[in-house]
Amino acid sequence: MSTNHIQPLLDLLYQGKSLSREQAFEIFSALIRGEMSEATMAGMLVALKMRGETIDEISGAADAMRAAAKTFPYSNGDSLGNGIVDIVGTGGDGFNTINISTTAAFVAAAAGAKVAKHGNRSVSSKSGSSDLLAQFGIDLTMSPDTASRCLDALNLCFLFAPHYHGGVKHAGPVRQALKTRTLFNVLGPLINPARPEFMLLGVYSPELVLPIAKVLKALGTKRAMVVHGSGLDEVALHGNTQVAELKDGDIIEYQLTPADLGVPLAQISELEGGEPAQNALITEAILRGRGTDAHANAVAINAGCALYVCGIADSVKTGTLLALSTIQSGKAFELLSQLAKVSSETKE
């Protein structure tokens, strides 16, 4: 295992210097190919973390991951209301909430958005998006062709990250041994193989909101909201949400309150989640229109922002209202049942 070809780049990092986007692409491509020892990988990730990753470094790492990913066979639309949207969080916010973004994906799709949700197993709670979906019998290992058919037929598909990004396995032992956040903690939402034009992306720290919006711009995302909601990696029902919105090539920063979204404030304790089986019951109740007000509102404000970002709603408030009416209709639960059926019809 030789890293001679990237040693000059490693030396730059060890000197506290920044890498260009192209250099970051080269060094992370080597990692993905399994050409880097665990010791070298740990040194690289810690060097980046201690200095603080730049926009170019995050973008280059995402470029490498995207280039190496299994292809998702889908032709994206390129206009508002037509392209693909993802509702995703970095995880790692430390709160054990219900599966808000995953549940919101069903609501947004039932309201007319084309949602390709890129997810993994739990990071910040007892139940990640993939843990939850497995409870409903949704086949996480569905082939890319099957996922594409789901997106065509149902406006929704889930792309299980390890199924598309096999090279990440090389970093697993190092990430576990380091026991600290690294660049990989923000890469997941940036490497959706469907290449969504529109994104609602939650981050675990308010310091990441603007930088990640800049990364999305560098990666060619058309329109996005990057959010941190009073400790959560999603739009908050219990306090203010910090937003960096990417629109028409510009990034504007502002804050949202629950009142701005047309819903009352709730306590974070009202959103506490549990194990996958318990969270599945909560998600089912929400999607059937039988959830608590706090649960329904938390999901609706996130689905509503996604509907705004992808152009179906003209404001976050009207998006939230559309999401709430979709929840009450029960359409989102019908969609869940259909996805479970279609996703399991064809095995790879």
From Swiss-Prot:
Positions of anthranilate 2 binding: R175
EC number(s) stated in the UniProt entry for this protein: 2.4.2.18
Gene3D superfamilies found in the cross-reference section: Nucleoside phosphorylase/phosphoribosyltransferase catalytic domain (3.40.1030.10), Transferase, Pyrimidine Nucleoside Phosphorylase, Chain C (1.20.970.10)
GO cellular component, one term: cytosol
Binding site for 5-phospho-alpha-D-ribose 1-diphosphate: 89, 92-93, 97, 99-102, 117-125, 129
Co-factor binding details: Binds 2 magnesium ions per monomer.
Record's protein name: Anthranilate phosphoribosyltransferase
Organism expressing this protein natively: Shewanella putrefaciens (strain CN-32 / ATCC BAA-453)
Gene designation: trpD
